[in-house]
Amino acid sequence: MASRPIVLRFESRNGQFRLTVNPQDLFPSLQPQILERLPPNVDPSSITLSNRPIGTGGEERLLNSLDGVGFDKVGLKHGDKLFIGYQENQGQQNGTANGHITPSAGDASRRLNGAPVPQSETATIKNPWDVVQQSPLDDMLDKKDGKIKRGLDTKFCRHGPKGMCDYCMPLEPYDPKYLAEKKIKHLSFHSYLRKINASTNKAELNSSFMPPLSEPYYRVRRDCPSGHPQWPEGICTKCQPSAISLQPQEFRMVDHVEFSSPDLINSLLDFWRKSGAQRLGFLYGTYEEYKEVPLGVKAVVQAIYEPPQVDEVDGVTLHEWPNEKEVDEVAHLCGLERIGVIFTDLLDAGRGDGSVICKRHIDSYYLSSLEIAFAARMQAQHPKATKWSRTGRFGSNFVTCVLSGDEEGAISVSAYQASVAAVEMVRADIVEPSAEPSVMLVQSEDDDTENKSRYIPEVFYRKINEYGVSAQQNAKPSFPVEYLLVTLTHGFPTDASPLFTDSSFPIENREVIGESQELVHVAKKLVTHGDPDKAIQAVSDFHMLCFLHSLSTFNKDEEALLCRVATQRAPADGLQLINTPGWATLVTILQESGERPPKRPWLPTPEPYPPRSVPYNPGKRSLPSSSSSSHLRPESPKSESERLAKRFKGASLE
């Protein structure tokens, strides 16, 4: 009596299929049916069968080696599953046979004017969070555990020194009780990241990674899939932004701002003391770990560069900065980057004791609506790269500092950041500064009658009403600026070790108070009476490095060596520097300009390296353009409208 047919299941890396066989059939009889269900370039002699997935330690046998073996002899029953492994024919896969190129059927059908068109490789589109390059600091903080360790609680712990209970187990970095106890108002960025990632990517689900962060987007999406005309001709619920509900941001991208030396602040204040006008400068430094806050980040300021500007009693106006890229390049050679901006808002109290008027306090404002809009524009120009965001970037580490009077009449520093929502609202042109510094205005679509490209969504915020209840309010026409502001801490190191140890070189763009950068200042700093250590100390000045860069006397390698001498101050590097052709060119320029050049033996003009010729007019150096502050004296505001003018109109989004 013939046996009833059985169904066997087969699985390969191409998928699964079933075959109906007789128990008395032999294994090699399945080869034609198996080849029909595998790719065409499979080598038939490489087909392998196994009782487990290929490569996991099962009993793997070549199909050709099972000649004479039937299914009933190995105990296979109805519904059993076998795993198939195979190798592809490399010669056919690469399109070669016996050393000749053989076009495939697909290539043969692809022709242009009778000539075959080779098929191009398919470009793999990767997710932004897979290819983005984070900073080394973020990579280091991502690897940290971040939990807050606690000691034994003598009141509640009942176990030994090696035990652990609920009263002494480590806390998460976002634990609300710990933050309230330490009076930490905002979570650090990486603590906030741990908090939201714990609910987005749960380890027990074994699901694929999804970035927990997403940047807010308050503009009309141009890539709407609904098929209607683009805005402003058409709009739907898929492309229009949702209503905005403002609330104070619970985290901050940077927790602390540290100035490496008090001289940085004093040099900026000197301009106000001499002119009575305000001043603005960009902060250059690094980002480091801030251990006072769980997984915290601090911005360490090493230098302040003052760009071209027009300074007035009530504010400043930024002008075009022609050498912006050059200054950033010098900072990069010194291991620095632009990390923030600082400006003064000072008014003398008139008592003759150096006290100033306190304009920023709890009953007025801390950062005006105009300054928040300026900070938001600056942060939009310096986004933060992170693999935890769907777009590959989120927020910004750019900080904004203000020098103003406190309630005691002393000059103090305050550090802030605009919230992530504030940056997007400014980018989407939803808000605009108000004449009242403590409120921000919401734009109206009626104001844009000529250009209908702007869409203003509904904006709401919550406040405590007259009955003591938190109620939702419509933000139009204005709302408090506190909803767009994040406060940071600031301070100075206990043991100061600034990167640049000299600050005697004149600061740039100060011709309005009679200070300019000239070659005579370079000559004076380099005349060190034969002491190399003093010369190394002299070039350790960021403003001098930027001035030397403008002379174009050093090539890239020599300038990198100069910046290394300025930051590391190694005597060996200093001696190597003075024997470079660029240094010889600098000495020649000083001689031709009539300035006093260095005359000591340690600063000779090296004979093997003839000085390079550079385009330079002796005794004359080009000054900033007519738009710079060197041609304008600080003036007092003549009307109320000038006092309320947009003082930072020079800054704009790219």
From Swiss-Prot:
Residues 257-394 form the MPN domain. It comes from the Eukaryota. It is a peripheral membrane protein. Residues 632-645 have a biased composition (Basic and acidic residues). Its main location: cytoplasm. Pfam families: NPL4, zf-NPL4. Residues 592-654 are annotated as: Disordered. GO terms for biological process: mRNA transport; protein transport; ubiquitin-dependent protein catabolic process. The keyword Protease does not apply. One of its GO terms (molecular function) is ubiquitin binding. The keyword Ubl conjugation does not apply. Belongs to the NPL4 family. PANTHER family: NUCLEAR PROTEIN LOCALIZATION 4 (PTHR12710), NUCLEAR PROTEIN LOCALIZATION PROTEIN 4 HOMOLOG (PTHR12710:SF0). Involved in the import of nuclear-targeted proteins into the nucleus and the export of poly(A) RNA out of the nucleus. Has a role in the endoplasmic reticulum-associated degradation (ERAD) pathway. This is Nuclear protein localization protein 4. It comes from Aspergillus niger (strain ATCC MYA-4892 / CBS 513.88 / FGSC A1513). The gene is npl4.
